[in-house]
């Protein structure tokens, strides 16, 4: 049977019908559509969507131009695609002022460039310390700590569950001693540090605070961020330890403690990054992330905390994926929505509470192992979208993201990508340079509406914790992930080097972490436990368990709650209790969480 050739594109009966669909074009646009567009489409129909070769158009008659998330894109955007009451003052505004669509700072990057914060951590604290110093010497503006899986799960390196994972996907941190090594020779009053840690966040943060204290740093002056976003663990990343309610209690403990003792430190980075990496659409990333933020504020207010006390230290973390304009629209909508929610839903009076400050990381999930050097171009475009969207800090993934932890060369190229955008592209010289684009403004409003639709659904469920227990966000993400995979396998979405333009290639040089790191960490733990006062460790852990078992209530007379766990964790850290020992003490009180089956 002869091979069926792809058919020619078919011209619709009315090729300009979409010009009038759900919109009111101007007389000039109607004239253009009839006199210029229609004849053009008759002579040269628009190209097929998806793969350039081997796809039968008869089988793809439902294909449309869409974003990577599947949102339809019009041929041309004009004033007709904006609300009839659209004005610059009402919908767009000015940078540094409500509704914050154009940014939270009046001067944008003319005042201060985004912080170039490369996510890094591998093997031992000693090796990672050297990598941090290398990055700082080559222009990095801050440190972002990647921990290994045992640390993320609250296990010491010598625990049976840690076998084969020590130092593999981040740095192994077991005790205060390791944290002292990690930041040795780095001035913590002058360096902002972000730590990607969630279930054991309060433990690792306590270790950081004690290291700063030992350096002679003033807690009032140190700045940085702990991720501390447990909700997205239940939704997407799955690195949880305790059930949702006690986990939320630990998060609110850090809010209260931070407001009192570390006013410049962000006690949470509410994270959409992992939600997107799990397969969500851009809209789902936006909506679920912001609603996670709403949930944290609700829980903090129920504790009796004032939103204007902790609100200014809430920060966010977003993904930068491949669809350039969709990503920029997402960031702009996020700022606008958050400012509105904080004012109208929570009655925040402090303008700093209205501001959404966010970090961005390029999309690791978009960087395939095939033809990895292509990822340099992908990362550059993603990073550019983040900058045009007004990010406060940025991490560029390395081109070898899918293969291993980055080599020194790969990490340097990633940092240089940020620097080229900042210093050579010209995009940082004016504020919100794409503002006013009909396409971008329409996309921003579409994101905003979609997010509030999700908010209504989650409100009806009783909040995000209730939604998680029902499996709602998990199901939404699973369906979106399936649809994207289907589109990739059918070549409806082209992935260069993966489903099109494929070549045979050799494997590149990658970084390898051997098992000596685990042996080294185990030996250090043995020595530590022999040297420290184990009676003091037991005393501090018993005190922590007693506090954790109490119901926390709002503090009085400017003090924090007597049951706040943070002071007890700090005491245990000072006694050189390990990450695993502190987390085990909390496991004894709270138990562990098993996810319900999602069907």
Regions found by a protein language model. Name each.
Residues 1-177, 183-189, 212-215, 453-456, ...:
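Acidic/polar, glycine-rich intrinsically disordered N-terminal extensions of enzymes
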């Amino acid at each position: 049977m002869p091979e069926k050739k792809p058919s020619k594109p078919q011209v619709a009966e009315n090729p300009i019908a979409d010009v009038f669909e759900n919109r009111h074009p101007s007389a000039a646009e109607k004239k253009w559509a009839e006199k210029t567009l229609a004849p053009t489409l008759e002579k040269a129909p628009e190209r097929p969507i998806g793969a350039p070769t081997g796809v039968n158009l008869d089988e793809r008659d439902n294909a449309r131009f869409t974003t990577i998330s599947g949102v339809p894109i019009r041929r041309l955007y004009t004033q007709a695609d904006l609300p009839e009451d659209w004005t610059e003052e009402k919908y767009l505004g000015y940078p540094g002022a409500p509704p914050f669509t154009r940014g939270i700072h009046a001067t944008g990057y003319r005042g201060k460039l985004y912080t170039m914060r490369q996510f890094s951590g591998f093997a031992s604290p000693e090796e990672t310390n050297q990598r941090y110093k290398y990055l700082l010497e080559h222009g990095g503006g801050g440190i972002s700590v990647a921990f290994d899986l045992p640390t993320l799960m609250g296990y010491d390196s010598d625990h049976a569950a840690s076998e084969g994972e020590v130092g593999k996907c981040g740095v192994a941190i077991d005790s205060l001693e390791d944290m002292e090594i990690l930041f040795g020779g780095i001035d913590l009053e002058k360096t902002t540090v972000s730590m990607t840690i969630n279930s054991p966040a309060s433990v690792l943060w306590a270790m950081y605070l004690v290291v700063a204290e030992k350096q002679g740093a003033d807690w009032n002056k140190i700045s940085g961020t702990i991720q501390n976003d447990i909700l997205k663990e239940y939704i997407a990343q799955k690195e949880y330890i305790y059930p949702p309610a006690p986990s939320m209690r630990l998060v609110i403990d850090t809010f209260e403690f931070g407001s009192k003792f570390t006013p410049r430190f962000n006690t949470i980075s509410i994270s959409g990054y992992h939600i997107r990496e799990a397969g969500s659409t851009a809209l789902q990333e936006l909506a679920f992330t912001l609603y996670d933020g709403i949930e944290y504020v609700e829980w903090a207010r129920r504790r009796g905390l004032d939103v204007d006390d902790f609100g200014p230290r809430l920060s966010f973390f977003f993904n930068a994926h491949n669809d350039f304009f969709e990503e920029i629209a997402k960031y702009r909508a996020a700022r606008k929505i958050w400012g509105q929610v904080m004012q109208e839903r929570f009655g925040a009076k402090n303008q700093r509470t209205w501001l959404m400050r966010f970090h961005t990381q390029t999309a690791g999930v978009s960087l395939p192992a095939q033809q990895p050097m292509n990822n340099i171009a992908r990362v550059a475009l993603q990073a550019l979208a983040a900058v045009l969207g007004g990010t406060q800090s940025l991490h560029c993934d390395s081109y070898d993201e899918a293969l291993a932890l980055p080599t020194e060369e790969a990490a340097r190229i990633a940092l240089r990508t940020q620097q080229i955008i900042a210093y050579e592209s010209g995009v940082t010289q004016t504020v919100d340079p794409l503002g006013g684009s009909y396409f971008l403004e329409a996309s921003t409003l579409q994101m905003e509406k979609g997010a509030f639709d999700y908010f209504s659904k989650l409100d009806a469920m009783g909040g995000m914790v209730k939604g998680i227990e029902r499996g709602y966000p998990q199901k939404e993400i699973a369906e979106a992930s399936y649809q994207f995979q289907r589109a990739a396998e059918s070549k409806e979405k082209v992935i260069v080097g993966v489903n099109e333009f494929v070549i045979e290639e050799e494997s590149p040089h990658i970084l390898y972490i051997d098992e000596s790191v685990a042996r080294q960490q185990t030996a250090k733990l043995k020595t530590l436990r022999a040297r420290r006062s184990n009676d003091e460790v037991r005393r501090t852990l018993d005190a922590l368990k007693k506090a954790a078992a109490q119901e926390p209530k709002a503090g009085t007379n400017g003090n924090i709650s007597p049951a706040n766990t943070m002071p007890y964790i700090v005491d245990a850290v000072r006694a050189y209790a390990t990450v695993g020992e502190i987390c085990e003490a909390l496991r004894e009180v709270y138990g562990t969480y098993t996810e319900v089956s999602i069907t």
